[in-house]
């Protein structure tokens, strides 16, 4: 295909883009279709706008170091900023432009040609290791245009990521793109070696750290977690005095006489009458209420007679409690 052959102007733009500082705010989007003076001036202005720390000689990337995984690139403040703006727009432009280079989509979004944008993408690939996988679905056009950097790749859209794989072989064979390449079925011999080494390293780590618990352990009930300790601690949590929730009230003779007289007058106290009794006898309302409940339950248990409402409900089949304890609860206020 004629579109896959890199143009001389685009190759020169890619070489110059690699010489410029790689961490400009619009780095992945300014690759033009040729080496025009206006675009070169734009690149120089962007280089002048960068801090002096980012322009140190150690931060410049050389063409043979395109491995998509360098620590000096990760430590830059601009790392990962152009993931959505630069590379995804370039990939979308490649998908819209097809084999012609995607000049319509990428130039409209970022101001550069599709093929030139792919050249710049290759130059900035060592800066952002997570940029390349989002552009793989729509990289049918522009990415093969820069395929001359990776030997043995001329099949187009089916192996677009092998371009970055070939560039990665010269540097770091165990980069972060191994997972994405294996997911797309592009893993080669070196990728299988790295996967074996990764699995063996993972097994060694698991052997060296036997105290690591799986995630499901922390998602189960509290009794199944290791942090809850042995299960023999459970009986200790129980309160031995669970039955003695309320202390028994020791009424005086005067209080008992007054309560019995009030009970003879009316077995059921109103709230107002209960409050007045509590103030007169220096008792709590709950103590007076419970005494009246207990007194009614004792009388009912001794006589065995049910109140008229209970008899009426039992005749209709709506009330048939067998024990007197439950019947005593029905009389409670």
Swiss-Prot record:
Keywords: Autism, Autism spectrum disorder, Developmental protein, DNA-binding, Homeobox, Nucleus
Ranges of Gly residues composition bias in the record: 25-36, 95-117
GO molecular function per UniProt: DNA-binding transcription activator activity, RNA polymerase II-specific; DNA-binding transcription factor activity, RNA polymerase II-specific; RNA polymerase II cis-regulatory region sequence-specific DNA binding; RNA polymerase II-specific DNA-binding transcription factor binding; sequence-specific double-stranded DNA binding; transcription corepressor activity
Regions of compositional bias (Low complexity) in chain numbering: 142-151, 191-200
Cross-referenced InterPro entries: Engrailed_Homeobox_TFs (IPR050720), HD (IPR001356), HD_engrailed (IPR000747), HD_metazoa (IPR020479), Homeobox-engrailed_C-terminal (IPR019549), Homeobox-engrailed_CS (IPR019737), Homeobox_CS (IPR017970), Homeodomain-like_sf (IPR009057)
GO cellular component: chromatin; fibrillar center; nucleolus; nucleoplasm; nucleus
Signal peptide interval: none
Annotated region described as Disordered, given as residue ranges: 1-49, 95-206, 223-250
Annotated localization: Nucleus
Record's keyword annotation contains Nucleus: yes
Main location: nucleus
DNA-binding region: 244-303
Taxonomic superkingdom: Eukaryota
GO BP, sorted A to Z: central nervous system neuron differentiation; dopaminergic neuron differentiation; embryonic brain development; hindbrain development; midbrain development; negative regulation of neuron apoptotic process; negative regulation of transcription by RNA polymerase II; neuron development
Family to which the UniProt record says this protein belongs: Belongs to the engrailed homeobox family.
Associated disease: Genetic variations in EN2 may be associated with susceptibility to autism.
Name recorded for this polypeptide: Homeobox protein engrailed-2
Organism of provenance: Homo sapiens (Human)
């Amino acid at each position: 295909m004629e579109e896959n052959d890199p143009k001389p102007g685009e190759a020169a733009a890619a070489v110059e883009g690699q010489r410029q500082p790689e961490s400009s705010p619009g780095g992945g989007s300014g690759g033009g279709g040729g080496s025009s003076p206006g675009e070169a001036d734009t690149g120089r202005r962007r280089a002048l706008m960068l801090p002096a720390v980012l322009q140190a000689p150690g931060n410049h990337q050389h063409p043979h170091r395109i491995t998509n995984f360098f620590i000096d690139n990760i430590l830059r403040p601009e790392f990962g900023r152009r993931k959505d703006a630069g590379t995804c727009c370039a990939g979308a432009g490649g998908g819209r432009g097809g084999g012609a280079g995607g000049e319509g989509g990428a130039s409209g979004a970022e101001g550069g040609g599709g093929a030139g944008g792919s050249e710049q993408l290759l130059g900035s690939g060592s800066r952002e290791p997570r940029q390349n996988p989002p552009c793989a679905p729509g990289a049918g056009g522009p990415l093969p245009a820069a395929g001359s950097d990776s030997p043995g790749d001329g099949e187009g859209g089916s192996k677009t990521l092998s371009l970055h794989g070939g560039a990665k072989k010269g540097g770091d064979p165990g980069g972060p793109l191994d997972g994405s390449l294996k997911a797309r079925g592009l893993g080669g011999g070196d990728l299988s070696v790295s996967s074996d080494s990764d699995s063996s390293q993972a097994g060694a780590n698991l052997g060296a750290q036997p105290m690591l618990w799986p995630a499901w352990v922390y998602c189960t009930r509290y009794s199944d977690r290791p942090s809850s300790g042995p299960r023999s601690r459970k009986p200790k949590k129980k309160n031995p005095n669970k039955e003695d929730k309320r202390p028994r009230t020791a009424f005086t003779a005067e209080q008992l006489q007054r309560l019995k007289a009030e009970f003879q007058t009316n077995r059921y106290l109103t709230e107002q009458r209960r409050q007045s009794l509590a103030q007169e006898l220096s008792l709590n309302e709950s103590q007076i209420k419970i005494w009246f409940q207990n007194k009614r339950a004792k009388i009912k248990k001794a006589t065995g007679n049910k109140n008229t409402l209970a008899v009426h409900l039992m005749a209709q089949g709506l009330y048939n409690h067998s024990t007197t304890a439950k019947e005593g609860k029905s009389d409670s206020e």
